[in-house]
C-alpha cells in the first residue's frame, strides 16, 4: 500500500487526554505517538511513557503545573497534544489555560467504568469550554465480556449527555499497552481512535476569523501626528482607515479611525491576530485612552461588571495566600493588561475558600471590562497572583 502523501499545510488542532487517575491517559498518549511514528515515520516522533509522565514543570501566570506537550500528524491534521499526569495538574491546566483544547480524548478503563474523576474532568471541560469530547475505552484486552463493555459505554454516554456533550460521540475500544507491545489488533485500535479524532473533532475557529480586538498596553503622543496605542492583537484583522471603538474601564466608549498601522517601525496596511502593533488614532488626546481598555471593531464587544467565574486558588507553596478568604473578599481581577477591583460572592453553602481549592464565584467589578465567556483572568493582591480563573457566565 502506497504511503499517503502528507500535506505541509494541514489544519492544526489542540487536543488532550483527560480522565480518572490510572485509567491510562499517559499510556494512551504514548501509544498514539508510537503507532503514528510506525505508520508515518517521517512526520512523527515516538514518545516513551516516561518522557511524557515526567513532564517538566511549567509556570503559567505564576502557577506551577506539570504538563507534557507532544505533537503528531495524521493524514488530515497536525495535532498538539497535552497530557497532565496529576489530577491537580489537570485542574490547574484547565482553569489557567496553560493549554487550550479544541477537543479532548476521555480515557475510561473498561475494567472500571467511569469513576469520580472521570465525571469531574468532563464537568470541568464543560466549564472551561472544551468544545468536543470523544472516548477511548482503554484496557479492553482485559475484558472478555461484551455485555460489560456495552454497559460501560452506556454509562460513559450518559455522562457526556449530562454535560451537554455529543452523546453519539465515538467510543473507541483500545488497549494502549497492547498497542505499545505491537499487537496488531490494538495497533489498529489506536489508528481507529485517531481517525475518530480527525472526523469528529471540529476544525477550530481561527482567531483571525473573529471580530478585531486589541488590548491597550501603552499610549504615547507623537507631536504633530496624534495619539498612538500599542498592544498585541488578540483577535481578528484590522485594515488601515478602519473605524474602531475604544471600550472598557470607563463609562462611555469612544469611536475613532486608525490612520496608521506600524509594526517594528514599518508601515503596514493590516494588522492581524498575533501581531504586536502600534496604531495611530485620529483626533484622540493622550488622556482619552488608558491601559486596560480595548480597541475593537465597533459593536462587536460589550463591557460588563458582573460575571461568574471558575477559579483555582493558589496554595501557600505556590506563592498564594496563607489563609482562607470569605464572602465579600475584594481582590484585584487582572484582565488582559490591567487590574480592576471586584467583590466576590461565594456560592451558597460555601463559607470560605482555602488556598489550593477550586471554586465557582460571582464577581462584581467596580469598572466595566470588555469580556465574553471563556476570558481568563488572574486574581491579585498587591500585584501578587493568588488565583487564576475564567469567566463562565456573564450576568450584567
UniProtKB/Swiss-Prot annotation:
Gene Ontology cellular-component annotations: cytosol
Keywords (A to Z) from UniProt: Cytoplasm, Elongation factor, GTP-binding, Hydrolase, Magnesium, Metal-binding, Nucleotide-binding, Protein biosynthesis
EC number: 3.6.5.3
InterPro entries: EF-Tu_GTPase, EFTu-like_2, EFTU_2, G_TR_CS, P-loop_NTPase, Small_GTP-bd, T_Tr_GTP-bd_dom, Transl_B-barrel_sf
Protein role: GTP hydrolase that promotes the GTP-dependent binding of aminoacyl-tRNA to the A-site of ribosomes during protein biosynthesis.
Residues covered by region (G5): 175-177
The protein's assembly and partners: Monomer.
Listed GO MF terms: GTP binding; GTPase activity; translation elongation factor activity
Domain tr-type G: 10-205
Family stated for the protein in its record: Belongs to the TRAFAC class translation factor GTPase superfamily. Classic translation factor GTPase family. EF-Tu/EF-1A subfamily.
UniProt region (G1), positions on chain: 19-26
Record keyword Hydrolase present: yes
Name listed for the protein in its UniProt record: Elongation factor Tu
Gene3D superfamilies: P-loop containing nucleotide triphosphate hydrolases (3.40.50.300), Translation factors (2.40.30.10)
G4 as annotated region, ranges: 138-141
Cellular compartments annotated: Cytoplasm
